[in-house]
Amino acid sequence: AAALTDPYVLVFAFLIGMFHWTNYWDFVIYYVMGGMGVIWCNCQNYKELEKPHRMRMTMGISLLHAVWVFLLANIAALPFTLQFQSMVSEVALAQNHSRPYQYWLIWGLPAIGTVLFFWCVKREGAKKADAFGVLLGISALGLIVIPEIVYVRDIYEKEYARSNTMFKLTYQAFTMFGILFGYALIRLWMEKRHVIRKILTSVVFACFVGCCFYTVTAVHAWFGQVWNPAQYQGLDATAYLETTFPEDAAAIRWLNEHVTGDPVVLEANGDSYSDYERVSAMTGLPTVLGWYVHEWLWRGDTGALNERAQEVEAIYTSTNQEEVKKLLAIAV
């Protein structure tokens, strides 16, 4: 009972349960990662027992934790999942794979640095602080390998089958590698007894510093001459409206200042990453139909989307006054 009511276990279950309504991919990722952490903790808790009994206790309690956390996480997510319809169809074997040189261009440095860290831990013996680093490394390596083996089938199946799986998993891998490197490079550099390992660490660190220069290129590519005050853009995402759509900018300010509640804003529907749906985006008010592809991705079915898109278009283009009034009554 004490193992199930541990505050850390309860908080962990609730927090990963939140991933159901923020990003379900992260629920799977951190459920597995957290499970590995729980197994390690249980190994430490029962390390004084004899080996056969220690293994049984560790795996038994870990399995109990796994079931309990999964149950609590799903209970925490019930207010969302009871009304949610997933767009995922199934998991399939990957038919396309990354080209080796492209794969290693992106992941070679963090993978080599991680393996070097594992080597150090194995040869010198693991310190208590190494456990989290090892957990991050194993998880990150697994996340960059999985999309080369399987992927989740969704609306991108025909043209970009692995794109969503690759993005969701490797994004988390990138984050884990970044956290790991902050610890691993210092851990490796402080090792004084192994000259070869220190040389390899220096090479990895030099490559890492070289990669940091990309930041300068990226900033200039996105924002131009940042040192020129005349080209300052700032962090205000609505600023472009003042020059591109000044009338809309004024309307958005008025809505933000005067409208209360959640009335529906009717806007023409368009593609993702465009100027469509700008009023609902900048005010937070609901609209009849958001960016088409995003709405499709969240639902996996275009039937209702096409119907709504046609109705919105009819409201703006129809010459039949009665039809427009009827559609407005339904939509807004």
Protein language model features and the residues they cover:
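Membrane-interface helix-loop-helix junctions at transmembrane boundaries of multi-pass membrane enzymes
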Residues: A2-D6, Y46-M59, W119-I138, K192-I199
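Membrane-interface alpha helices of multi-pass inner-membrane proteins
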Residues: L10-T22
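Alpha-helical transmembrane segments at the extracellular/periplasmic loop-to-helix junctions
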Residues: A1, F70-N74, L78, A94-E124, ...
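Extracytoplasmic
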Residues: V216-V332
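Transmembrane alpha-helix segments characteristic
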Residues: D6-F12, K127-Y156, S202-C212
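Perimembrane helix-loop-helix junctions
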Residues: Y30-F70, E90-Q95, G113-E124
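Membrane-helix boundary/interfacial segments in multi-pass membrane proteins
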Residues: Q83-L105, I146-M176, P229-Q231
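Signature aromatic-anchored transmembrane alpha helix within multi-pass, membrane-resident enzymes
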Residues: V9, M59-N74, L188-V219
